């Protein structure tokens, strides 16, 4: 078999079920590479009924013969890393010798978290809905060339000088602009010395490791976080994350050449969800706190257990948006789609799919680039018949209800991409592979 470099990305607003699919496919790879985002991601894996939630470490860590790389596109929170390593090793998994970290990873430090939270508070009802974990401010420091990187932990005297300079700037912003408490230098400096003990032994030249594995003919998996519609450039700006969540980010965020990427698998929920603020044309509004709103929105949220793995926040739920998926197919160059959570729709009498928007009396078949324009569109739906029977655990195409097959084929037509994998439940075993990405 010829080696394959597979990229796995979310095609919606995140929470599509990427972790399960990466874990499923990692029995065929030598390493899994995270290439963007930080510990704001929450990848939930269920294996033999046991649930594991990962925020930073690649999902391949649960397979003991798979190495895990954290690429330069990831912003690294040392405390989150330490906690996750400890939790995994408490279960008997050996983590540290299999985890390699790029020395170019920007570090998320206490002042990034303080800034993130102060900004969200200042935005009031215009809040973006960040996780408040310092992701955005850390990426800002990277682009402004004042960020501290994982490799800086190798030289503590230089690190101390860089930290003092960075903290002067950020504490000035915190105290004078946001009227918030400053971050204490001595406390953070002591933490950084402990961070070095944890991280420095795991530092590695990730682009070189990727190149060596490719030359040896080994398969690699590149694991995205969040989703395409949260991409800093292609998403519903400014209600986006601070990194490139699309397939192109796999190259810039890890150091692999783009021509080395062989297959782009887009993880796509059979309906739509979104966390936080921002446009969502197909939303079925329901508030779990008051138990008020749309009945189907409630059912999707309840059956789909739509609460964030990282924050616990209620996810907004809605019908499948094929307009948004067309954009995802374009900007990712999707080879195939993995459709997840089909079973959540099992008890619906009818299922709607948004096939186009209407704006100013015109049909719109691709999403607008700005959030302001996005808020003005109206969804146009096609209605399909539900199947009213369980699809949980179905492991063959022929065993699917006829109406479910019709729904899947309809989505394929509207997206312009073939469904290659079907997830019929949370467990690793509840998956139907229609087209093997490693065999294409």
From Swiss-Prot:
**Major location category of this protein:** cytoplasm
- Pathway in which the depicted protein is active: Purine metabolism; AMP biosynthesis via de novo pathway; AMP from IMP: step 1/2
What EC number(s) are associated with this protein in UniProt? 6.3.4.4
Where's the active site on this chain? 15 (proton acceptor), 43 (proton donor)
Q: From the UniProt record, list the reaction(s) this protein catalyses.
A: IMP + L-aspartate + GTP = N(6)-(1,2-dicarboxyethyl)-AMP + GDP + phosphate + 2 H(+)
User: Which key words tag this protein in UniProt?
Assistant: Cytoplasm, GTP-binding, Ligase, Magnesium, Metal-binding, Nucleotide-binding, Purine biosynthesis
A GO BP entry: IMP metabolic process
Please tell me where IMP binds in this chain: 15-18, 40-43, 131, 145, 226, 241, 313
A molecular function annotated in GO for this UniProt entry is:
magnesium ion binding
**Binding-site residues, Mg(2+):** 15, 42
Concerning Pfam families, the annotation shows: Adenylsucc_synt
Locate the residues binding substrate: 309-315
**Function field:** Plays an important role in the de novo pathway of purine nucleotide biosynthesis. Catalyzes the first committed step in the biosynthesis of AMP from IMP.
Similarity comment text for this entry: Belongs to the adenylosuccinate synthetase family.
Q: Any idea what this protein is called?
A: Adenylosuccinate synthetase
Q: What is the lineage of its organism?
A: Bacteria, Pseudomonadati, Pseudomonadota, Gammaproteobacteria, Thiotrichales
Q: Which gene encodes it?
A: purA
